[in-house]
Swiss-Prot record:
Active site: H136, K157, D175, R241
Protein name: HPr kinase/phosphorylase
Comment field on protein domains: The Walker A ATP-binding motif also binds Pi and PPi.
GO biological process: regulation of carbohydrate metabolic process
Upregulation: Constitutively expressed, with or without glucose in the growth medium.
Classification via HAMAP family: HPr_kinase
Region entry Important for the catalytic mechanism of dephosphorylation, spans: 262-267
Amino-acid positions noted as binding Mg(2+) in the UniProt annotation, renumbered to this chain: S158, E200
Reactions mediated catalytically: [HPr protein]-L-serine + ATP = [HPr protein]-O-phospho-L-serine + ADP + H(+); [HPr protein]-O-phospho-L-serine + phosphate + H(+) = [HPr protein]-L-serine + diphosphate
Family matches, as Gene3D superfamilies: HprK N-terminal domain-like, P-loop containing nucleotide triphosphate hydrolases
Other remarks in the entry: Both phosphorylation and phosphorolysis are carried out by the same active site and suggest a common mechanism for both reactions.
Length: 314
């Protein structure tokens, strides 16, 4: 649960009034600058949002007649309002301080400029209030691509991750991956605090990757881009040998590219994952080897077909 108190501590803000409301829960990622409300229009006032007051809002407020000021601020401070933040180290109006105390609305000041603070708060709130889920798998950063390795228990996910780490790649999470959907089509994965930096190898036990391989072998969090699903090789199953079949894995409301890799003795899965990551990077740059091969093949078939027709005409 995200509260106003945690926001104050995170951004080192200064409390002015309304300390009794510090445990209010923040539920909305949106932030408002109540310009219309300062003018007296409260019909669509989003009172459940954090309110930012900067130079523009307070300059207009100072132009209001004395008899309107107190009522305006009492309407601004609602029981459901998580916080009102005055930026640029400006002096909060006395009427606002009184209203904040009356309605137990946290009144906070910040030295940061309004636009800059809004940007930082939005990023923070989207991250903290994002939808979350957990998946069984291993998350590794391979050539800058967040690769989620999944498969049945005992298939060799952790062993593959260990080989990737030895080859210079970085571990994010093993066994349990916490995933946040911080925005549309953007998933961020990390390890639970309890198992951070740890890797379980059957027959060996739990190892601390950072202790063994150094700080450069681990990463706190990584954006998920590619899913490598490991499964035992089935003779009767037809596997994609060209790369034209597009599979996806849906996590929350976001889909990421999925590649199914059959596992059997003699296959170096770590190298295959490295190549898959590099090939994914080429694909997002607009280079698709499978499609280029398919185009060349179709052109060759068409050319041979035309040559055959010309021979028949002769």
């Amino acid at each position: 649960m995200l509260t106003t108190k945690s926001l104050v501590e995170r951004f080192e803000l200064e409390m002015i009034a309304g300390e009794a409301g510090l445990n209010k829960q923040i539920k909305n990622t949106d932030i408002s600058r109540p310009g219309l409300e300062m003018a007296g229009y409260f019909s669509h006032y989003a009172s459940d949002r954090i309110q930012l007051l900067g130079t523009t809002e307070l300059s207009f407020y100072n132009l209001l007649p004395d008899e309107e000021r107190k009522g305006r601020m009492r309407k601004l401070c609602r029981p459901e309002t998580p916080a009102i933040i005055v930026t640029r180290d400006l002096e909060p109006p006395e009427e606002l301080i009184e209203a904040a105390k009356e309605h137990e609305t946290p009144l906070i000041t910040s030295k940061i400029a309004t636009t800059q603070l809004m940007s930082r708060l939005t990023t923070f709130l989207e991250h903290e209030l994002a939808r979350t889920t957990s998946l069984h798998g291993v998350l590794v950063d391979v050539y800058g691509v967040g690769v989620l390795i999944t498969g049945d228990s005992g298939i060799g996910k952790s062993e593959t991750a260990l080989e990737l780490i030895k080859r210079g790649h970085r571990l994010v999470a093993d066994d349990n991956v916490e995933i946040r959907e911080i925005s549309k089509d953007e998933l961020i994965g990390r390890a639970p605090k309890l198992i951070e930096h740890l890797l379980e190898i059957r027959g060996l036990g739990i190892i601390n990757v950072m202790t063994l391989f150094g700080a450069g072998s681990i990463l706190t969090e990584k954006r998920l881009r590619l899913n490598i699903h490991l499964e035992n090789w089935h003779k009767e199953k037809l596997y994609d040998r060209v790369g034209l079949n597009e599979e996806t894995l849906r996590i929350l409301d976001t889909e990421i590219t999925k590649k199914t890799i059959p596992v059997r003795p003699g296959r170096n899965v770590a190298v295959i994952i490295e190549v898959a990551a590099m090939n994914y990077r080429l694909n997002i740059m607009g280079i698709n080897t499978a499609e280029e091969f398919n185009d060349r093949l179709n052109a060759e078939i068409l050319r041979n077909g035309n040559n055959g027709n010309n021979g028949e005409e002769k």
